[in-house]
Amino acid sequence: MASLLQSDRVLYLVQGEKKVRAPLSQLYFCRYCSELRSLECVSHEVDSHYCPSCLENMPSAEAKLKKNRCANCFDCPGCMHTLSTRATSISTQLPDDPAKTTMKKAYYLACGFCRWTSRDVGMADKSVASGGWQEPENPHTQRMNKLIEYYQQLAQKEKVERDRKKLARRRNYMPLAFSDKYGLGTRLQRPRAGASISTLAGLSLKEGEDQKEIKIEPAQAVDEVEPLPEDYYTRPVNLTEVTTLQQRLLQPDFQPVCASQLYPRHKHLLIKRSLRCRKCEHNLSKPEFNPTSIKFKIQLVAVNYIPEVRIMSIPNLRYMKESQVLLTLTNPVENLTHVTLFECEEGDPDDINSTAKVVVPPKELVLAGKDAAAEYDELAEPQDFQDDPDIIAFRKANKVGIFIKVTPQREEGEVTVCFKMKHDFKNLAAPIRPIEESDQGTEVIWLTQHVELSLGPLLP
């Protein structure tokens, strides 16, 4: 019964650019292509950037300028949780009368988990609650900025060279006699719009400005390394003052060795992204723009369109002995769905993981439509489907339990069975051309899914 909640034991095959096997809850369904889609066969588009702490929304250009970090929120350098701003009162001397003191509010950063504070590293308190926190300066900033400018100029030069070579290849392929014979010579000799090869030869990176080539000094290897202190191997080590590997990797520009060198880092921004089908370029998932909203404008998850198979009970599986496995089929749509199960044909390229022989019900299965109110209505009259008790174990609302027979074909290892599931689907997507008056109702199409079940290990 515990296998009923283990959806990762039932995999569906996605026939995309690359064959992917994944649970139905991790897949999408394109209503225009009528095919399953995985995260590897969709296009990812960034809709917006936002801070997960203060939920500030910002455009992509601003996020790039801020290096994809929030300007107001910080992460604890010790445990990586969000830092909070604490207020305290400190006594300060009056500028008019130094002998007298007055209470003044001061703010500092503190972590509620590991008790780290900005005072531990000597950061001065601030008189305002947000902004203005001291940040350590990277000694290699100038060198890195110089390298970035140099390679940007180099990339621009290479782009100009590529454009020059492309225009040099565009030459007249028709012979001069042929063009003169049919009166095309004058037409071909007319000046063409756009830049010619001669004008392109004098192209510069910035037209109208003096080009100053950026030169950088090559890095030089150091022959002599600074020796270690004499007491490096003999002095006792206090592990509470030594940073962990994760703490050092979170600050690669400083690589702090001691806990006293840990400074807070600006919090990374998160994104809201849209997913688009690569084949038809329709949206499969599109969230709302507001960071506080968890709703979606478009969310074509496969569990809302494709019948879901789950394993309800697994008997003791033994080599070359037939066992009966109970599965559940769930209809996610509101109309009746007809499902037919059949075994994979011999030599099927998709049937590569099967280790057991499976016998599925030969009859067509009818699943009732999804009705949320009927699940809680005990007085509702059940529909009469005239089920065969040898095939149907139970039926409740839009769920039905069916029996399949499994015979393991290998003496050891995991038991995996594969079969095909054919079902009808009413395509409710908006058609490209308007439906003619003679067409009645929505289009019904038949889809076939490849399903793999992981039934666990064999018993001796």
From Swiss-Prot:
Keywords recorded for this protein, A-Z: Acetylation, Coiled coil, Cytoplasm, Cytoskeleton, Isopeptide bond, Phosphoprotein, Ubl conjugation
GO cellular component terms, semicolon-separated: cell cortex; centrosome; cytoplasm; cytoplasmic dynein complex; cytosol; dynactin complex; focal adhesion; kinetochore
Outcome (variant: residue 51 to S): Loss of ATP7B-binding
Cellular localization per UniProt: Cytoplasm, Cytoskeleton; Cytoplasm, Cytoskeleton, Microtubule organizing center, Centrosome; Cytoplasm, Cytoskeleton, Stress fiber; Cytoplasm, Cell cortex
Main function: Part of the dynactin complex that activates the molecular motor dynein for ultra-processive transport along microtubules.
Superkingdom, taxonomy of origin: Eukaryota
Protein name: Dynactin subunit 4
Family note: Belongs to the dynactin subunit 4 family.
Xref: PANTHER family: DYNACTIN P62 SUBUNIT (PTHR13034), DYNACTIN SUBUNIT 4 (PTHR13034:SF2)
Parts forming coiled coils: 152-172
Keyword Phosphoprotein: yes
UniProt keyword Coiled coil, yes or no: yes
A Pfam family of this chain: Dynactin_p62
Positions of post-translational Phosphothreonine modification: 407
Impact after mutating residue 76 to S: Loss of ATP7B-binding
Residues that bear Phosphoserine: 196
Location of cross-link Glycyl lysine isopeptide (Lys-Gly) (interchain with G-Cter in SUMO2): 215
